[in-house]
Amino acid sequence: MRARTPKRPKLAVWKFASCDGCQLSLLDCEDELLAIAGKVEIANFLEASRAVVKGPYDLSLVEGSITTPHDAQRITQVRKASKFLVTIGACATAGGIQALRNFGHVREFLSVVYAKPEYIETLATSTAIAEHVKVDFELRGCPINKQQLVEVLSAFLKGRKPNVSSASVCIECKRRGTVCVMVAQGIPCLGPVTHAGCGAICPAYHRGCYGCFGPKEAANTASLSRQLTVLGVSEEQRQRLYRTFNANAEPFRTESAHA
């Protein structure tokens, strides 16, 4: 009798409020994606294919934040249909750049952007997926690091915990031999409080880190803010520094409120 082919785990990729950049990072994996594709069944990935296989799903990758009542309901359905759920990118893990609405009045923004704002159904805030459902792992970045994404997928296939660095961008600067832009040039930089993963691209080109990978674990933002003050950075400038792609992530949110 012919042996049965082992059933491949189902992978689903979901989009909420986002720019699709993190999904494109998955497609950009190229050779690595081809190897992984042979070990999983890509059941739902509208960025790559219109073909959809019904759940339940073994692993769901979720990009984007929750900004509408409909999406708040939809994410609960995705969670119910998924054995494991991993959020990918700043939008899904912290609310994204669109979370700047959380610090103002959303109706004022709508009146500026849309000719008929009364037709727009939206929530007053943009929130991370973890504020609505249980998340098994968060992969940060804007966009995500594709090597880290491959590590997460490989870890899932092997039944182990992903090995993703929890260090700061400062460590990445040291590893690539980049001179500290804040110490040497007095350039404001969020590197000491930002999660590693970008490869310290901005400091390598003499620009301060602007926190696209979000706050690292136990980030000492209060200490950094004091140093920024020494450098002559105003309260308004400090607030703008913390309020970018991960404005709604703690402790960036709290520290920006103190500025």
Q: For each predicted feature, which ranges?
A:
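Short secondary-structure transition/capping segments
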Residues: 98-100, 152
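Short gly/pro/ser/thr-enriched loop/turn and capping motifs at secondary-structure boundaries
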Residues: 91-96
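Short glycine-/small-residue-rich Rossmann-like dinucleotide-binding loops
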Residues: 64-66, 90
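Active-site neighborhood of phospho(di)ester-bond hydrolases with catalytic His/Asp-centered motifs
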Residues: 86-88
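Iron-sulfur (Fe-S) cluster-binding modules
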Residues: 1-61, 71-72, 76-84, 107-259
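Short, hinge-like loop/turn segments at secondary-structure boundaries
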Residues: 102-106
